[in-house]
Amino acid sequence: MDMTVSNQKAESDDGSDIDDAALLQKINSLPIDQSITNSVSLEKHDFQGSDDHDSSTDLSDSTLEDVEGSEWADVSRGRYFGSDPSESIVCHNCKGNGHISKDCPHVLCTTCGAIDDHISVRCPWTKKCMNCGLLGHIAARCSEPRKRGPRVCRTCHTDTHTSSTCPLIWRYYVEKEHPVRIDVSEVRKFCYNCASDEHFGDDCTLPSRSNYPESTAFCEANCPSGNDASNKEFFETRRKEFQLERREQNRNQKSSKQRPFHKPGNSLASRLGSKPKSFKRKHSPPSEENGNLSFHSSDGRKFTKTSKKNRKRKW
């Protein structure tokens, strides 16, 4: 029984081999299309060349002048569909095509965005006159007459400093056209001085290291709903308090400078309970006689000295 099964399997294997051989003979006997063979050979050549060197990814040494025309289509980003060399290069200065930022013909101001007008250093928005408060020029070139009198800051309108040293410059806020008011109860309070959640840092009564008399954004008067007359009253009280403190400091400095000077002899005599001795000059002021200077000592002796006018030169 086993012998018959093995013989059947062998016959089936031989039959399959015969069928495959006949199929191959039929395929080889078919006519060959020359266009198909040419396309297959080109694909093989391109595939082998891509392993050795890929020209589409090596753009380190190629430039717009070296690669032009049909060669650019092979190395550019759109090599499959073709692209214009001038469209693939974008200028980072003016965002134009066909040139780089080094060769850009336009002048762009990075402050106000003006093109072909001025550079960033000469932008009128970066210059502010300390005399008239307008933009576009400085105080040395201001056409308005010089203002003399008490110094007033044009930013916060206080007389404790000038506009150039105002502490509000780095925290100056631009108001919106339609401000949104928020309820005071919704604002979370937190003190940066004593870590309390009942008041702001500027309203803290404990001693602080901050030396700024003007209030910052962390105060009750600077809340979104406190933009009214109470805000002005708060600033007025703070300004008056600061002025009083400055006056007291100036008085203390003046009083310390005007203290009477006590000689060491007087203080020692007052401690010992005796009066200080009168100070006597050792020599009386000189008197001029016949062109000579005479001096009298406390003992009555007289000294004479020839003046420079009557000295005879040795030569």
From Swiss-Prot:
Residues 287-297 have a biased composition (Polar residues). One of its GO terms (biological process) is nuclear mRNA surveillance of mRNA 3'-end processing. Its main location: nucleus. Residues 43-68, 244-315 are annotated as: Disordered. Signal peptide: none annotated. Pfam families: zf-CCHC. Transmembrane segments: none annotated. A zinc finger (CCHC-type) spans 89-106, 127-144, 189-206. Keywords: Metal-binding, Nucleus, Phosphoprotein, Repeat, Zinc, Zinc-finger. It is found in: Nucleus, Nucleolus. The keyword Zinc applies. One of its GO terms (molecular function) is RNA binding. Residues 43-56 have a biased composition (Basic and acidic residues). Component of the TRAMP complex composed of at least cid14, mtr4, and air1. Belongs to the AIR1 family. This is Protein air1. The gene is air1.
